């Protein structure tokens, strides 16, 4: 009997699909049943070949050999995962297999993972596509009942290949040109470089900012009411101190007459459902989680616990076909503290409206929402529980009615000047009940603060006991943190050097710099390349990052290039542009930037050379700030030796409770805190043993230290290493 091979992206998803399809016979890298053989990739198993596979001379990085422009880029099996590639290949080539079902992640990159494997195997069998947004049993069954023809995704595949090949031509050539021309480990790309440029621009804004003092007036009445002065244009601030001084002097011994009490009934609706970027922003603001960390937690909740839908989505809406599943999802997530809230929603028919249901705003995947899967909180880690809480509360909030309140504005006259006060009376808590009325609106910047207003009638006279001048200073723009950098990457139009509205709109509609799936990796890569560094929560550009921006061609610094590329990649995905035309343009552009770098007369200066020599090659080591501590890195790219000098750990200072830094090597390591606290590693081990009731042994401490090291080191797995060399996205 003929069978179908199902290619999943990861083993965990493959196991879920195999269970639903009753494939319980285990093989080498696959699971088999009567109709289906389920096998899996491990992320990418196949990638674009290194330059040296085209010509042995490219093994050495020489400026005169650039640009490297092979006529056709080749695919190669990633060495570290070759065993699994061969396992997939053997199943695809079986004579009893007459169909391939692509079940990798439903998106551009997922399409590439499977199609590159199929292309490398050189197999020509009919392809079908499984396109689902969650991996619950129900979603898998429904997906297999509605498989799509593979041909429907040919253009999406062409778009994914075009992006990868363009990044190879431009990224590898620009990086080699910069590194060999300026004798420094420099890398750039169409997303990395403009992101660094945005951080530099923000620092320049802060540096050039000149604070101005502004002035206002506040009147306090005997019934504890605070009144705020406003000019004829409704402004509460003035930069003219003399003017404010004069007004204050003229108001002495005047009382306030109530001219008007304006009552307005207002509504506010819940913020939209989460896409990945919005979730990463909130997790960073509330819990300090990095974008990468939030994505990893979401992946667990999606794949392992099966309680949330696909994380790598750029939509904040659900499609109309999902509305019918909402009651089941509410029942599933309506446990524990969420039970009364979910029960309240289920009492009435769910009203689907355009604020969260819009087919036109859902492309590959809908917003992140709970699945119909069983929720077992005892299996969650603390971090998983926090992320799940964010998603469930947002899901419940959009299903609750609007927050309704009465806005009261009190307008008074003191002398000849206008003073106002504002208050709010809640009429119906609505969606804010989900957040126990503690939801904070980020955009509230009004100088007139809301207060509890006493009972007052129009025409009343209020006794003024104090009139005082207030003052403040204008603030410089805040430095980027991971939350605000994600926002800037998502909508970088203010940093573009073009007035082309269509291009700006395309950048906005295609999600800005990078994609929801790649932004976390891009930020991580910038930290690991020492182009940016973290001080507290703030992100700073390094000297290396500054110099890179001075050395790269101007176009590579602007989001405009990404806007143009995304416009064309979108056209390829829609079948409106041939991949070959786009790649031809990219090759020509590569020639231009390599030529510009070659002819540059600028110099790169290492200003972080340490007194230490590299133990491998003897060259001076560079001292750099890694994401979680200081490191020594060999300045020779081909050597690549690096070593931790210190790293921030999760151990807390017993005096000030801040995170301790671990310095030194071996038995001589010490924990140090900014407050001045110092503790030897051996003493720390003894203290931990006592605190845990003598249960901790040497193995426990070693395990703890190993975990710290694992958290500190950059992502290092076979596909990450291969992709690090080839993808500059």
Curated annotation (Swiss-Prot):
Please tell me where Mg(2+) binds in this chain: 9, 105
Locate the active site: 310
Any one Pfam family here would be Topoisom_bac
Q: Where does it sit, as one GO cellular component term?
A: cytoplasmic replication fork
Q: What is its EC number?
A: 5.6.2.1
Q: Locations of Basic and acidic residues compositional bias?
A: 686-713
Give the Toprim domain ranges. 3-136
Q: Where is this region: Interaction with DNA?
A: 187-192
- What is the enzyme's class at the highest EC level? isomerase
Q: Name one GO biological process term.
A: DNA topological change
List the CDD domains hit by this protein, alphabetically.
Answer: TOP1Ac, TOPRIM_TopoIA_TopoIII
Which SUPFAM superfamilies does the protein's record reference?
A: Prokaryotic type I DNA topoisomerase
GO molecular-function terms, A-Z:
DNA binding; DNA topoisomerase type I (single strand cut, ATP-independent) activity; magnesium ion binding
Cofactor(s) needed: Mg(2+)
Site description Interaction with DNA, residues in chain = 61, 168, 176, 312
Q: Start and end of every Topo IA-type catalytic domain?
A: 153-594
Region listing for Disordered, in residue ranges: 686-718
- Provide the reaction this enzyme catalyses: ATP-independent breakage of single-stranded DNA, followed by passage and rejoining
Q: Which UniProt keywords apply?
A: DNA-binding, Isomerase, Magnesium, Metal-binding, Topoisomerase
The protein's matches in NCBIfam families, at most eight in alphabetical order, are given as: PRK07726.1 (NF005829), topB (TIGR01056)
* Role description: Releases the supercoiling and torsional tension of DNA, which is introduced during the DNA replication and transcription, by transiently cleaving and rejoining one strand of the DNA duplex. Introduces a single-strand break via transesterification at a target site in duplex DNA. The scissile phosphodiester is attacked by the catalytic tyrosine of the enzyme, resulting in the formation of a DNA-(5'-phosphotyrosyl)-enzyme intermediate and the expulsion of a 3'-OH DNA strand. The free DNA strand then undergoes passage around the unbroken strand, thus removing DNA supercoils.
In terms of PANTHER family, this protein maps to: DNA TOPOISOMERASE 3-ALPHA (PTHR11390:SF21), PROKARYOTIC DNA TOPOISOMERASE (PTHR11390)
What's the family?
Answer: Belongs to the type IA topoisomerase family.
Q: What is this protein called?
A: DNA topoisomerase 3
């Amino acid at each position: 009997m003929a069978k179908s091979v199902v290619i999943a992206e990861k083993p965990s998803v493959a196991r879920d699909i195999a269970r639903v399809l009753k494939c319980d016979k285990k093989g080498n890298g696959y699971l088999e049943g009567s109709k289906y053989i389920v096998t899996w990739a491990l992320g990418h198993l196949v990638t674009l070949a290194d330059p040296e596979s085209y010509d042995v001379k490219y093994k050495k990085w020489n400026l005169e050999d650039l640009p490297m422009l092979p006529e056709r880029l080749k695919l190669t099996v990633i060495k570290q995962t070759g065993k699994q590639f061969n396992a997939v290949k053997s199943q695809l080539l079986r004579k009893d297999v007459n169909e391939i079902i692509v079940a990798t992640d439903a998106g551009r990159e997922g399409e590439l993972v499977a199609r590159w494997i199929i292309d490398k195997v050189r197999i020509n069998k009919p392809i079908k596509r499984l396109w689902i947004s969650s991996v619950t049993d129900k979603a898998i069954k429904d997906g297999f009942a509605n498989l799509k023809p593979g041909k429907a995704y040919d253009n999406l595949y062409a778009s994914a290949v075009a992006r990868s090949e363009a990044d190879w031509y431009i990224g590898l050539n620009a990086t080699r040109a910069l590194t060999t021309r300026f004798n420094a480990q420099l890398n750039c790309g169409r997303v990395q470089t403009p992101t660094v440029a945005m951080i530099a621009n923000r620092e320049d804004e802060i540096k050039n900012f000149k604070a101005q003092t502004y002035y206002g007036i506040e009147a306090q009445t005997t019934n504890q009411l605070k009144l705020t002065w406003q000019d004829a244009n409704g402004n509460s601030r003035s930069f003219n101190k003399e003017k404010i001084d004069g007004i204050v002097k003229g108001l002495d011994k005047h009382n306030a007459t109530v001219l008007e009490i304006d009552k307005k009934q207002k509504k506010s609706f819940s913020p939209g459902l989460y896409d990945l970027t919005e979730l990463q922003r909130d997790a960073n603001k509330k819990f300090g989680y990095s974008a990468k960390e939030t994505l990893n937690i979401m992946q667990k909740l999606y794949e392992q616990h099966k309680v949330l839908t696909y994380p790598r989505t750029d939509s904040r809406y659900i499609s109309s076909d999902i509305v019918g599943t909402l009651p089941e999802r509410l029942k599933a997530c309506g446990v524990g503290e969420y039970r009364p809230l979910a029960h309240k929603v289920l009492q009435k028919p769910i009203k689907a409206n355009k604020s969260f249901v819009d087919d036109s705003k859902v492309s590959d995947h809908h917003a992140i929402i709970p699945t119909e899967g069983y929720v077992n909180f005892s299996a969650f880690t603390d971090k998983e529980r926090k992320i799940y809480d964010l998603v469930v509360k947002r899901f419940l909030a959009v299903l609750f009615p609007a927050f309704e309140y009465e806005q009261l504005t009190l307008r008074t006259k003191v002398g000849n000047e206008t003073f106002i006060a504002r208050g709010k009376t809640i009429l119906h808590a609505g969606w804010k009940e989900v957040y126990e009325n503690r939801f904070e609106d980020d955009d509230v910047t009004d100088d007139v603060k809301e207060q509890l207003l006493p009972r007052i009638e129009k025409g009343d006279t209020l006794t003024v006991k104090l009139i005082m001048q207030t003052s403040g200073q204008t603030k410089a723009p805040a430095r980027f943190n991971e939350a605000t950098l994600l926002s800037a990457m998502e909508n970088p139009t203010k940093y573009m050097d073009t007035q082309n509205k269509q291009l700006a709109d395309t950048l906005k509609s295609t999600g800005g710099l990078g994609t929801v799936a790649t932004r976390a990796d891009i930020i991580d890569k910038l930290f690991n390349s020492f182009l940016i560094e973290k001080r507290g929560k703030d992100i700073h550009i390094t000297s290396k990052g500054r110099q890179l921006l001075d050395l790269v061609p101007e176009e590579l610094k602007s989001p405009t290039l990404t806007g143009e590329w995304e416009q064309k990649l979108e056209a390829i995905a829609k079948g409106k542009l041939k991949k070959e035309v786009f790649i031809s343009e990219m090759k020509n552009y590569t020639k231009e930037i390599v030529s510009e770098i070659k002819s540059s007369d600028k110099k790169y200066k290492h200003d972080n050379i340490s007194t230490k020599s590299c133990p491998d090659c003897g060259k001076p080591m560079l001292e750099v700030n890694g994401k979680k501590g200081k490191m020594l890195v060999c300045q020779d790219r081909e050597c690549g030796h690096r070593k931790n000098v210190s790293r921030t750990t999760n151990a807390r200072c017993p005096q000030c409770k801040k995170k301790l830094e671990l310095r030194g090597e071996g038995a001589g390591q010490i924990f140090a805190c900014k407050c001045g606290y110092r503790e030897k590693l051996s003493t720390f081990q003894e203290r931990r043993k006592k605190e845990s009731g003598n249960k901790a042994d040497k193995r426990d401490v070693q395990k703890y230290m190993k975990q710290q090291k694992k958290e500190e080191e950059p992502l290092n797995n076979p596909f990450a290493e291969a992709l690090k060399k080839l993808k500059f996205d």
